[in-house]
Amino acid sequence: MSNQGPLRPEEYLEPDCPLCGNPYESLHPVRPVPQQRILNKLDDYMSRRDYDGAERHLLYWLKEAEQGRDLRGQLLVCNELIGHYRKTGSRENAFRYAELALSLLEDMDFEGSISAGTTYVNAATAYSAFGENQRALELFERAKALYESTPHTQAHLLGGLYNNMALVLQTLGRFPEAFELYNKAMKTMETVPGGVLEQAITCLNMADAVAAQLGQEEGEARIFELLDRADELLHDKSAPHNGYYAFVCEKCSPTFSYYGYFAVAEELQREAKEIYERA
């Protein structure tokens, strides 16, 4: 027996597994971050359009999740950062956290999970927003295969996938495939509470697709039909008048203005402003 004193735990315990609890009392247990509290506070920042505050909030909790070895928490925050940087136009940061999120899926062996599908969609949407459409389509196809083969995939996830994937196909000039997915998105979101907002966005995307395929003059009747339907959906009584509604109003307003629906565009901007001022 050595006279150097008792063995220390690190001298006889196996290395910790970062994805599971250690049966021998891990020296560095996982400290989960409060996921719902993080999301609730993020909603508060976004309802006030406090993008700087939202960024600080997310980066703080990402660091906490990293220090606490909470891989699930890191994945959640990375997904939110992808969306944040996409909305604020930060290409480099959006791609950085997209790739970090994808690597976390590999680390956790989550690539066949619904969480993976959500991450693929978020990353693909960011790549699409900054013109990397082939990379986006690759990720959307992964998500589509996963969602459609998984029983009980939530309708809002499928609807969001179909709409955003169609937008990429439209950009690539693959119009028949794009319209097929837009129609799937419309049908799917009919079953989602508050899904009228996503349906309105899809209608406007379809109007742009018609204009791109046929030209504004030839496609005018169909374009106006889609714009009228989008206006109806945005003002449907089931639409939630919250921070997200304000964001959607701001997002849709320029499209209405582009096609000459100036009164509708101004009304949407006014509604968004009123919601933000009340927040």
Describe the role of every protein-language-model region.
Residues 28-29, 67-70, 107-111, 149-153, ...:
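Short coil/turn linkers that connect adjacent helices within long alpha-helical scaffolds
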Residues 109, 124, 151, 193, ...:
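Short coil/turn linking the two alpha-helices of tandem helical-hairpin repeats
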Residues 31-68, 83, 87:
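Alpha-helical segment of the N-proximal tetratricopeptide repeat
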Residues 62-64, 102-107, 142-149, 183-191, ...:
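Amphipathic alpha-helical segments of tetratricopeptide repeats
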Residues 34, 54, 67, 74, ...:
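Residues that mark the junctions of alpha-helical repeat units in TPR/alpha-solenoid scaffolds
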Residues 36-47, 73-87, 114-129, 156-171, ...:
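Conserved alpha-helical positions within TPR/SEL1-like repeat arrays
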